[in-house]
Regions:
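Intrinsically disordered, low-complexity charged segments of secreted bacterial virulence
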Residues: 1-89
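Predominantly the structural core of cysteine protease catalytic domains
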Residues: 95-122, 145-299, 305-345
């Protein structure tokens, strides 16, 4: 910076020492040199901002003490990522090869967040949103040592539009994985989201963690764009059905939740058996949970296709079946209290 100031001072002195005619002729040259110095200054400023952001992210991670580990339930236990795992996850993100079928929820109650991630993977715009949010980070030795993750959320100021950069080099041992049981991009997003909340993986109410929540907020936290809810209380009108159909057939992420549906619709200890059609054409009953969130995969005049963040469903016998299923509109409006429609740009 001192060199740039000295250079500008020298340019000023040289220019002021010229006669008026030479000043007029030489002005473009001096302007070009001044612009070059300004570009260098702007570059230094951006580098300083980047270094400050990285420093803050690393400090935030270092100061984050995961709740729920010392008390013995272990829900917040974290597992470090090896360089090989980081490279594999980064390769998946860079390729854009992401699908809602990549996601299997395990011991953390963040179905609302995972359903929103699943919904983003459906469109190129949604996948780009994920790619833009996760950037691999390299250590001094040139090897990948984690990810810088942008989270559009500030739990201390929930009504304000804010974002933070979080450094992630570990994931929840009881958190989301791919079908192969290995961590993936969803694991990175989940880890960053938990790091943003004082309660980590604990309950979202009394502990201010990420277990329990609503798809609307999660969708906004992932996209930095507004989301709207279509209420199913009293059923979905023809216009509301059309709105959901149009959204499900667009690039926008769409999710649905059962938590706000009438409790009497889930008479079996918070569960209900519902007739559905699986992707292979098999008709069966699957168990729906009364406090769960799902991705809306598709919708048309005949019904709605959904995907369970668990990665599978259970039929009435307990048999595991495909995580994706199609149900009638009549059943959808009975069991799903609201539908969240997000936006990606």
């Amino acid at each position: 910076m001192a060199d740039l100031k000295a250079s500008n001072d020298a340019l000023d002195a040289e220019y002021e020492g010229l006669d008026p005619v030479t000043k007029l002729v030489s002005y473009p040259f001096f302007q070009m040199e001044a612009d070059r110095n300004k570009a260098s200054f702007d570059s230094y400023v951006e580098q300083a901002k980047g270094a400050a952001t990285e420093c803050a992210a690393r400090l935030r991670e270092a100061l984050h003490i995961e709740a729920g580990v010392p008390d013995g339930n272990g829900i917040g236990r974290r597992s470090g990522l090896s360089p090989e795992q980081i490279e594999a996850i980064n390769a998946q993100i860079a390729s854009g090869n992401m699908s809602y079928e990549d996601i299997q929820q395990h011991g953390i109650g963040d179905c609302y967040y995972l359903a929103a991630i699943m919904a983003l993977t459906k469109s190129p715009e949604g996948r780009q949103t994920i790619q833009d949010s996760i950037k691999v980070h390299y250590g001094p030795d040139g090897k990948p040592d984690g990810f810088m993750v942008t989270v559009y959320d500030d739990p201390l100021h929930p009504d304000a539009k804010a974002s933070r950069t979080v450094f992630v080099d570990d994931v929840y041992a009881n958190g989301v994985t791919g079908p192969d049981g290995k961590p993936n991009y969803a694991s990175i997003l989940e880890s960053a989201y938990g790091q943003q909340h004082p309660g980590g993986a604990l309950d979202s109410g009394k502990d201010n963690g990420i277990s329990g929540g609503w798809p609307n907020e999660a969708t906004q936290d992932l996209t930095n764009n507004p989301a709207s809810d279509v209420s199913g209380q009293g059923g979905y009108s023809s216009n509301e059905r059309r709105e959901i159909i149009n959204a499900a057939n667009s690039s926008n992420p769409v999710t649905a939740e059962t938590a706000s549906a009438p409790r009497e619709n889930f008479p079996d200890d918070g569960k209900a058996e519902v007739g559905v059609t699986l992707p292979n054409g098999e008709k069966t009953n699957v168990v729906l949970y009364g406090a769960h969130a799902y991705m809306v995969v598709d919708a048309d005049q005949n019904g709605v296709t959904l995907a369970n963040p668990h990665g599978h469903n259970n039929d009435q016998t307990g048999r595991e079946v495909d995580g994706t299923f199609t149900m009638s509109w009549e059943d959808y409006e009975k069991y799903y209290g609201s539908t969240t429609i997000g936006s990606v740009k």
